[in-house]
Amino acid sequence: MTDNGDTRMAGQDQAPSAQPGSGPAALAKTCNKFDAPMPTDLANALSHENDDSYSEERTAKRPRMDHPAGSNDVSNGQKASENNSNSQHADENGNENGEAPPAGTNGTVDRRAGLAPIKKEYIIEVSTNRNSKSDNVDDDAAEGRGGNAGDARDSREDRDGGPRGKKGKKEKRRKGQNTERSFGNSRDAIQLCNSRALYSEFSPHECKYGDKCRMSHDVRKYLEEGRRGDVEAFGGKCPVFEQYGTCFSGWKCRFVRSHMKEVEHEDGRKELVLIDKSNEKKFAGEDGTKGVKVSGGDGTDERRPGIYNNVDMSIKIELNRKRVDFTKADEYIKWMNDEANINNEFHQRRKDQSTESIDDIRARYVDPPFKPSEKRRLYFGPETPALAPLTTQGNLPFRRLCVELGCELTYSEMAMSMPLLQGTKADWTLLRAHESEVSPPAFKPSKTNFVYDDYDHSRDIRFGAQISGNQPWIVTKAADALNRFCPNLRLIDLNCGCPIDMVFKSGGGSALLEAQGKLERMIRGMNAMSGEIPITAKIRTGVKSSRPTAPSVIGKLAFGSREHRERLGAPGCAAITLHGRSREQRYTKRADWSYIGECAALIKAYNEQKDALTDTAAEPDPSTLPNSKDGRIYFLGNGDCYSHIEYQEHVEKARVDTVMIGRGALIKPWLFEEIGKAQYLDKSATERLTYIEKFVRYGLDVWGSDEVGVGLTRRFLLEWLSFAHRYIPIGLLEYLPPSLNDRPPAYVGRNELETLMASGNYKDWIKITEMYLGPVHPGFEFQPKHRSNAYEAEG
């Protein structure tokens, strides 16, 4: 198939390709198409297209994925693909190369469990020694932050690194992992003061630090000596300026030559000025006013257009200094603590205690100081595939790309509750959302698929926040803060499944699965203080594989403990998401969708028995009910969804309301598009490159086009490429559906660009970023989750 930028659907005829590669000329043409300069080292590399040793080095470093061997893998894959009757055989049956592979056809194919079934003509032979360097992939990088507490931060100052600590004995066993990652720094040689960054050279604007300021105030000197040259990608034009008519990075922009000029005054002086076209009609608002404004003059990224849930720095300072009034939350927390103490006293009573003393204990129970507000109604259904909360990977530019490709529900990266209460900028920044995420999901309510009369689609949005905490009082106050300072939230999700040691050992994440009384109090407290924002929870099957606890956890979340059920009603959990693995399993086993189906049946039974399990003497208070019709709970499944076939099977067979997708979206974000169209889409390498270009544009939009913003965009693009390179084009597969956990052998793509994008070699990832962001900064470092792919600046 020629790489002409067209999407190939399953069963669609494609042009034959005699050779897997199409030569360096095709890649050069691709770079020119997107105004991306051809990096020197990439040009040199492509000149070796006939050099077998180079091809082996670039394509052999494919990651191994943890996957249990067994005959089940083949039969399940074949059975799931029998429904795809439109697929055609593209090899032995005489069809052209590059066509969609057959569905479930095995024939004489040498199928090895855990190995992707790539067609023989694309597989290359590599030495055993070279293969041995490829280690197993640790996909926990996408689920929770690792040993670096400063990692996974969507802020410019705080995301570049974190505190380093000593390794414990258990950490030493995980020798292949970068548990304490550092990303170097991307700074200008001369730091230009923010008081000058957005103003013309002769502007009278004064620096608030006066003579004590350590930064430069000389714009000309900064441009000549203090910064690297302009990036040549995008034709040298600033993507932010092209979008808004002004650039929020000012003189610090790596594309500043495209929006600056020198003017000569009457007295002969020449002044450097920034161009501002935001008043022009195409950039103006609907009312004719100026479309965008640069806030404050301090170069901050807190007020970028199209970004919501921006929390003012003054509020963060007040939180840090403990000046925010949490009187109402404190009142509810005191009641919860008293309630817990009475419960402990009641359950620990002596057998010889008299009935009178037991009655005295019961008499001390009091009602909550106030009732929760009625919640905004939610809807989860087959039309609303959801993107899972992904630490580091689920940043705003990536979520924006997924929404553009058909994702209907998104979640923030996991924010820690205590840092939120301390006003930590990094955690509050995680809650920012793009304007596409705060619009209603793109489905139309109808009588056939929509029966909830009190659901207001116009008030619904796509974006929800996920938080983690280990104490009821912490998450209760965090929910209060989110309700007050982040108005654009669909829901607040409590993480009860994070397997990372740092979270688990502190009593949060999956540790809550074995502290169900505390978990119930956390949900009640959050529900009481979240205003109209619904509360949801994400759980795992359990901590230990041998001791699944999901059914009992679901019971507590749905109806509360027996001693509270009649008096207080349900805790108020609107939806539950179950990840079909235990904490112990991590990603070493497939997600257990049969178990998810059993829990879904349990939820259905609970919903049917709701009236019998709640107080029959009086109608339940609407504020105590979960956020759906008649107080019924939504149930989402999560784990290993990698095709529209699997998505449909999970909805129909496991009977979940919808599926939450994590790694599958990281590897191919257009999975949401496939789900919407109910067909496989064979994206060409050129099309996939356009998604990378969009990510870069979105990254520069949110993080800035200065040196720091370019460095952050490059880092998070590399984080994404560490997953995206594992995509195997369906035209290269023997049969469908593809398996998320299959490890691909070393192979060559249908052209040079496809081969480059399939490489597990970090040097090739760097080359891809250089197409749009220019050469890396001398101080830049990249350390992915596994050391085998680490990158450091070479000097």
What name fits each language-model region?
Residues 2-321:
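Cys/His Zn-binding finger modules involved in RNA regulation
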Residues 258-266, 413-419, 496-499, 570-582, ...:
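Glycine-rich phosphate-binding active-site loops on the catalytic face of alpha/beta enzymes
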Residues 313-316, 321-361, 435-529, 533-534, ...:
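Active-site beta->alpha loop and helix N-cap motifs at the rims of alpha/beta catalytic domains
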Residues 359-376, 392-481, 751-753:
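Glycine-rich, positively charged N-terminal anion/phosphate-binding segment
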Residues 385-389, 410-412, 463-467, 492-494, ...:
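Hydrophobic faces of well-ordered beta-strands that scaffold small-molecule active sites
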Residues 396-400, 472-486, 544-556, 613-661, ...:
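Catalytic cores of alpha/beta
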Residues 425, 432, 586-588, 595, ...:
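C-terminal helical cap(s) of enzyme catalytic domains, especially alpha/beta-barrels
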Residues 480-506, 516-631:
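Alpha/beta enzyme core
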